[in-house]
């Protein structure tokens, strides 16, 4: 039985990691009867094992809830779950475009974090009605009054209006549902107009093909009808329509304002772009919905199968993952040291780790990941501008007019006791101080301009250890700026290992090189000849380590006798070692690559 449009509410939940967003979603599902006893498990909307383990939400989930309000009327609430991590702000923006309201969940003991600010600003950009919720009030360390003041001072929301809740105990859930019904506006749109539906996510089903998640803005959608993707122009026939409750349930119709899913026998990932508009092929809309900005990868790295024969399996796995993850980009590449693999682009470091872990878990692949790098911009002496995603693409130093790297505006929220160590860390990472403001008597918001390359390694880990885990960060891209950058090559026994080349600021080149050559020295097994490991910028060697040769005890049988006899045997051994060094080939073990390329261990 279709519900009138004025009784539909589309909303999402935005929060920083660990502020209780997924637990609150569980309580809303439980309270409205969407989940009963046996099917209830913690973090229902976090369907990936990885999401539950790391306690974060990566993929979007959309659920329809039926709720009878205090006014006695039945309402249809569509909850769109969103990720909270800085890397997934693109997915957050997708879910926001499908909503009219947002629940802003803030931890009563931790207060507003940097990511909360970023997501609230995104929600305000989409003109959403924001309902503030102060969660975890059952904790002994909860300070709801302080958080209310922060909501007013930092975001400009009415703190007295905030709902006090404990998602763990289920306190305040009814009040939240009533506020959604009262404050979130019903969806607009005209059911009689030509169909326009926004694709805000998709997943791949081996039997039904691509299943797209839709929010209908105008018109109506029926099974069996032909639809057209407005960006690609491809046409398909709808085979199935449905909604998530959270289990999928088929329906005979979706109307303007509703959220649901569609299967239409779409076999190719590229045919249904997230952010595209679906329209009726017989009566198409005149213009598509304003599209999303396309997610721009910020961090690149190489993914290579340990076993070269698995290259096609990796390609197939990436194809499937990219279907569920619109922000993953990849292209084939070859490496003399690692063979065939892919150069992949990610939103950030967590995104990269999660993709790698999903490839290994869900597809059973063994992978080597090269050091992450950002996209550098090189202007050649002839005026040509190149985007460098891989150190091996960098032209010779003599042909480079200037090099630029991406800079970001980093916002750091931390307790005032840790200002010193954090500023020292930022200074060490070539940060330029911009601003510092107190958002409460104990908490400070510091902003720095920093090169993205300095953040993608282990900045977040260092920040957490410098502040005992109390700091949170967020960053926004500022654009490209000129920097003194060099390419450092690693040579083992005179052979360049392209997989270990890095682009780094001239001032940090020696420090980084020293760590890499020392680590290789410890990991490459000794041979019968001496192995020299070098780090070089062009022709100039800046760091060097040697692995001493294994020596056979040639003097063992030479008891007593003349010293010249012993010397002769040693000279003969030395000659053999020299000859071996010229023709010998060093096999570098997998662990050596893995260790040098391991992220965040500088």
From Swiss-Prot:
Its EC number is 3.6.5.n1. It catalyses: GTP + H2O = GDP + phosphate + H(+). One of its GO terms (biological process) is positive regulation of translation. One of its GO terms (molecular function) is ribosome binding. Its main location: membrane. Residues 6-188 form the tr-type G domain. It is a peripheral membrane protein. GO terms for cellular component: plasma membrane. Gene3D superfamilies: 3.30.70.240, Elongation factor 4, C-terminal domain, Elongation Factor G (Translational Gtpase), domain 3, P-loop containing nucleotide triphosphate hydrolases, Translation factors. It is found in: Cell membrane. Keywords: Cell membrane, GTP-binding, Hydrolase, Membrane, Nucleotide-binding, Protein biosynthesis. GTP binds at residues 18-23, 135-138. NCBIfam families: lepA, small_GTP. Required for accurate and efficient protein synthesis under certain stress conditions. May act as a fidelity factor of the translation reaction, by catalyzing a one-codon backward translocation of tRNAs on improperly translocated ribosomes. Back-translocation proceeds from a post-translocation (POST) complex to a pre-translocation (PRE) complex, thus giving elongation factor G a second chance to translocate the tRNAs correctly. Binds to ribosomes in a GTP-dependent manner. Belongs to the TRAFAC class translation factor GTPase superfamily. Classic translation factor GTPase family. LepA subfamily. This is Elongation factor 4. It comes from Desulforudis audaxviator (strain MP104C).
